[in-house]
Each structure stands twice: as structure tokens, then as C-alpha cells.
């Protein structure tokens, strides 16, 4: 048996079952597990490994760490095994801390993703069960219905009015009908009407299909492999990458220069090399990947408590930076409970005939469950025992109408409902209240006046039409012509009770709401006014079609409501908003929203949305409510703010200390700190920073969107690095010129000053307010105090002696304490000046 039977579309159902060694009732659980082990997970690319050994190795794969370990090994064999062992221990402990934190973050995220896992219905052991799509194997029998994503390349075994959207693979704009068939082996892909392709989705109808290919062996898998598709890089990821390159450039220049000068000054080569490498480790924020993972995972857990599930962690920063949110109105801004207010004839009088025809259409349609058809079916029921469904043309977003064909007393009747203009466009006649059929031109003005009157009151108004087809048992799109207009369906969906407060809350957070709807502009204007959006600026789909990309760019920011919008225009609107410099979120849950979700900086769907949307989304809301989004934005900004804190910490005190040490090493007759002491300094100062994810964030950091600003980070690094260096050199002067410290006393004194000042400065940098006005989290405070106390006690212990530290008299500790206090005060002043001049 091989995966993906050759030209499976040319085989009969029986031949395919034999080829894949399966049965119409599906595989057994045992056989499915065997095939999963044989063919692998049903993914386009293997999942990022997060097992224990992979994560552990990741902590030590930095080139700097690997070189340091190599140099330590040389030191072990050549000169000083004790020092080498100490350095090795510090590196391992640092790596284990990062591993422990990142492992916890990974596990937490996997649990959250399981909440919104995409599943497929399959037959296993003759029972219908839902399993994750990753577990689908060749030979599985899958059961599909409207809204489902096809989980693998498959052959149709049974179908009922099955229409599939293949645009993402073939570019075909209209849904394609699929049915059981045997086709020639050389049939082009777009004409294989018995084949289903992974990644496409069902628009209407239902099917039972045999999976013949999964993962990379699918048609879509081959395309994505050739193109090497990867998620679009976010601003946050780009910023982190640029920041990493920036630090590496500084580190490389500084370390090479220090090593060369120390060798020139005739100092031991190995000592100089280890010192330079230790400086490099101190300059480089080794824990940055772990801290980011911890921060994002912690933020994802907090967002989950707010009923917001993050599928792609890097999107959290974009979520916090978002300043425009685009959304449909139905169910998000409105109650989502559509009610049929009335069924009216051409004159606007109540009509049971219009209601009955609408009921026929809604009862027999097999597309994705929608609130309009549900409203029609529940408004009033009719006895349809004398009717039989014969055919269907499903709704699509270009025709904007749905037609069904029913058999009744030996004749066939086609009933169409949909957007009024689109229904009118296929009508040549209309039926009056008296039952007379007249030319459509005679009543068109009256129809349009009624439509405008209903729309201006906020009612969504559809048209209903019919056509007698005699003995014709099938229909196609061409059949939608020469129809008779019957009347109107008037529907309501009022705004949510709390929507005005929710929109105001978003506005206070600096997020503007733009409504994108297929409803006509009159309905959209009325609803937007009910939601408190006064002086609404509206752009319609037809107007949008006439605008060039440049013209749209000039208008898109000022428009509040986009009405009468076609699905392909949603993506164009999103891209224009992004090009105008906005961070754009798009909230959608319908079959036609997938491309817009992909185009947005943050794609947001809801748990109740169709699979194709949940698959495309970065973030999934467990409730379809903008109020949930408000809390999610706050949590996203909290996560970004805490990540930025670590970056600021890593580029201030640590950078200043290492820069000072590099400079001083050129003038001292001995190394200012031993390599093991530098690494210990780095380890101790990293400890409080590991708790940053739990820290509180001031309201002013949440109140408006912020974006990654590498220039501001560089300015921060220079400003606070210089402040740190000034006090480092004051420490040097006090130790050497006033206290006349010995070599070990100097190293101990500076070790104390470096670690304590770098730990305490965290409390200053974490907030824009004075540190005593912004309370840190208890974990950050405890970690800082533990490090300060441990640092003070370390020289008094046997371990301190091994590390080259010695107890200092009070005459040394007092000036060091004064310098640390002066440094904290100066940093507070520098912080105030910095934020008054630089926007971060």
C-alpha cells in the first residue's frame, strides 16, 4: 500500500478502497495508529520539537556559550581545573534555569492550543468520532459538511449537494460541485470533480470521502514545500532579530578589541580569551529567547482567563500594538439573533405566499448554518410532505443568492432568495398582491422605495423570487434568469446592549473600530448610529471597486463603515489600512473571512466559527464579543510591556558594567573580574529578570498602542549604559584611590556593586513612574531581595573563597552602599529626562 494512489480520480470507489486496504466503515483504531506511525503526522511541516532534550540543548547552542565551553575545557586540561569546573557549573545552572522556565511555558501553551484544536469527523471501528486533523491517515473515511476544511487529499465516496471552494489551490472564484465519478487519468486538477484537496473547504452540502494523501504528500503540501511557505514575520519578531544583530555587532567589536589589547599587553592568552568570552556572555542577553517564551506563555495564560486563546504567541505583541480593529457587525456588534419581522409582497403587505416560498428555500438549503435561514425556519413552520428537494445552487459571495429546486405534483419549482439587488437582476416579472404577473419594470421603483424605507430603519431586507421549470429536474447558475419577483423578507438584528460602552473602551485604548459588512449602506448607517458612531463615514463596495489602490490609501483611514462589501474586497481594505501604517486586527468567523484573516496583522476568529477561519486565525475568542477583545488587548499590551522591560534591563546595567570592565581591563595590571566572577554576575542578575512575566504593568503602558522601536532601545542602552558606567568608574576610583584595595578586595567590591546595583536597577527601569510609586510583583521583589542578600553573604562563605571573593570591612561596604544609592537616584533622574525626550 502506498500513500496517495496514482490518479485516484480515475478509480472506482471499490478500486480505491482496495488500493488503500480499507473498508466503507473506515479503519480500525489499531490500523489507524499503525498508519500514523508509518506516514507521520498530517502536517505540511513537522511540528517544532519541544521534547526535553531539544529544549535543553537549545539553552547551550549559542555560539558564544559553545566557544566558552570549549575554552573552559582547554583551561581544565592546561592549568586550572577548579576554575574551569566553576565556570562550567555556572553555565550549566544558567542553562537549566532557562530550560526549566521555557519547558513550563511550552507545556502551558500546548494546553491552551488544545482548546481550539481543529478536528475532523472520521469513521473508526465503525463509529463516527472527532479526532485532531493531525491524526488523519491515508485510508480514513472522513465525513464533511459545510464549513469544514478538507483534512487531506480525498476521493468522494458519497455526496449530497456538495460544493467546495478551491480558490486557494486553483484560483476558481466560484464553488465547485463535487460528486462520485470515474475520470480519465489525465484530467486536469481543476476538473477533477470527484477529488477533494487538502486545505480547501466545503461551502455547502455533505460528503463521505476516502483520504488518499496527507501532509506533504497532498497537492497543497507539494505547493507549500516548493514555496517554503512560512508565517509572516511580525514587528515583534523583526524587532527582536534586529536587536540581536545590534548587540552581536557591539559584542563582536568590543570583545575582539579587548582580547587583542590584552594579548598586546603580554597577559596570558588563555586568561585573556576566557575574560573576553565571559564579557561577551555578559553583554549578550542569553536568556532573551527563554524570557520571551516565558513572557508570551504567561500572557497567553492570562489572556485565556479572559477567554482569548492565542494560537501564535508572536501575535500577542501585534495584538497589543493594534490600533484598528475591523469587524463584521452580525453577532459581534449585534445580538447575532436574527429575527424575521415580516414577509411582504411587492406592495409591502404581509404575504403568506412569500413566507412559504422563503421557508421552502431555507428548509432545503444545505449550506453552512446561518442565522437568516434559522430565523425563517423558526418564524413559522409549514407542511412540506408534498415537496421533494431535487437540486440546489448554494449561496456564494459573488451571486449573493441561493436557489433550490423542489418537485411538487410532477413539476419542478425553483425558489431563489438573497440580496435584493442580486435577486432583482435575474427577474423579468413580478407578482402583485392580486396574483397578477406584471413586467418587472412596472413595479421596480415601488420595490426599490420599499427596500430603502426598510433599510433606513435598520432592517436587513432580502428578495424572494421563483420560476416554474416544468419537467426540468436539474438547475445551474444559468437557470437563474427570467424569474418572477415575489416579495421581501424583513429581518432585524439589534445592537448588543453593551456595545456603546465596549466601543468607548476600545477608543480609550487607542483602538478605532471599522465595520466591514455585506449589508447595504442604509442598514449599515442606521446600525452604526444605534451604536453611538455619529457622523459615520461610509464607503460602499461598488465605490471601492472604482478606486485605485492609491486613491483607497488616501481614504481608507477616514472611513468608519464599509458597506455592501464583497469577500475579496475585505482583504484589499485590510492591506490598505496596513500600508497606511496601522496595525490591523480583523475579526471574522465566516467562510468568506479566511483571506482577510491572513492579510491582517492579527487574525481573530471565534470558537464557534467555521474551521477554515479558526485555522487562519492567530487568536481565537471563546465568546463572540468585543468586550472579550478589550480585555485581550489589555493583556497583550501587558505582555509586550513586560518583554520590553527585560530588553531595557539587559541593555542598561549589564551593558554598562561589562563596558566599564572592558575599559578598565586596559589600565589595570590584573583582570578586574575573573571569568567565573563575570559569569556569576550575569547569572545572579538574570535571576530577578526571570520573574518579569509576573510583574505588574502601569496603566499608562496599556492605555495606547505601542510598537517595537529599535532606535528608542538603542538610545535607552546608551543613556543608561553611560549612567551605569559613571558609577562603575566611581566605584573603581573609591576602591583603588581611596581604599587602596588589594586585587581580591577590588574584585569583591566591584562584584558586590555590580550585582546589587544591577538587581536594584530593575525596580527603577520596570516603570516610568518613580520606583516607590509603582509596586512590583511579589515574585520580582522577592527575587531581587534574595539576590541582594545572597550577594552580600557570598564573600563570607567557603564558596565565596573558591570564587575568589573575600569578606570586606565596613569601611569598604559603606562607600559601596553610598555609590549604589546615588546610582539609583541618578537612574531615576535619567529615566525622567529620557522619557520626556524619547517616545517609546
Name every feature range the model reports, one short phrase each.
Residues 41-73, 106, 128-129, 186-195, ...:
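Soluble-to-membrane junctions at the N-terminal ends of transmembrane alpha-helices
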Residues 254, 258, 531, 535-586, ...:
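Membrane-embedded transport module
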Residues 195-203, 318-485, 491, 504, ...:
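Cytosolic catalytic regions of ATP/NTP-dependent phosphoryl-transfer enzymes
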Residues 1-128, 134-137, 142-150, 155-163, ...:
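Non-lumenal N-terminal regulatory segments of integral membrane proteins
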